[in-house]
Amino acid sequence: MIARVWRGSTRAEDADEYAAYLEETGMETARALRGSRGTLVLRRSHGGQAEFETILLFDSLENIRAFAGDDIEAAVFFPEDDRYLVEREPTVRHFEVDVNVT
């Protein structure tokens, strides 16, 4: 299993709305794909901002390509992201999942 990890930040006052938007766009899209093993959205507030870390779990790199396209290192953005994000990583990190306890 492979974890796809991305980070971005919103203004604190936009955090709840962005979390709902993120769920409706990226998270639902990822979970609907073959080979998806689930998603996590982590949030923490600090300095007037809310930092989001997303973790998408996939069976293989081919499954990630179905979500991200050929450049699997590039982050995937949706139309309203510019409205919310004050900071964002343009790339993602991929990790092999060594331990999965459910």
What are the roles of these predicted feature ranges?
Residues 2-9, 38-71:
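Short, well-ordered beta-strand segments in beta-rich or mixed alpha/beta enzyme
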Residues 23, 31, 65-68, 86:
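Alpha-helix boundary recognition
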Residues 40-50, 76-102:
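Glycine-rich beta-strand-turn "strand-cap" elements at beta-sheet edges
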